[in-house]
């Protein structure tokens, strides 16, 4: 699976509508309270500014937070970072998965209590988080206008993430 990330991968137009939906077998959490309740006793990887902010505001400390300080294509204040968290930075262009960003995600997943601050866009980094996350953990990411997707990291989710990434094109 690592061979996928030797070069930048671009999201093909045909996959955009698929990725704008909830993953099969994932839960859709409709509001902040549901997100916090679901995440409270789990190892969570939060992908996105709003998801990260929601968890921190409700006293949930994610294992890893990935955000870009942009929401709906507008700059915003970065989520607050809990004391004791390491901060890693990476670059990831819009509609891509960059090899360097994947390596930073893997490092963050290994060490935990880490923020990955993305220059560019973090949305598609939920896929490598699923691919490399520990079985039993959960990846939370926003689905604009619908809520937050909670995708359990298990064998099936890893295979699905890998299959989706295999449709991306080197660019």
UniProtKB/Swiss-Prot annotation:
Name this protein carries in UniProt: GTP-dependent dephospho-CoA kinase
Family as reported in the entry's similarity comment: Belongs to the GTP-dependent DPCK family.
EC number(s) per entry: 2.7.1.237
Listed Pfam families: DUF359
Role, per record: Catalyzes the GTP-dependent phosphorylation of the 3'-hydroxyl group of dephosphocoenzyme A to form coenzyme A (CoA).
The keyword Hydrolase appears for this protein: no
GO terms for MF: GTP binding; kinase activity
Biological process, per Gene Ontology: coenzyme A biosynthetic process
InterPro entries for this protein: GTP-dep_dephospho-CoA_kin
Involved pathway(s): Cofactor biosynthesis; coenzyme A biosynthesis
Binding, GTP: 49, 51, 68, 122
Entry annotated with the keyword Ubl conjugation: no
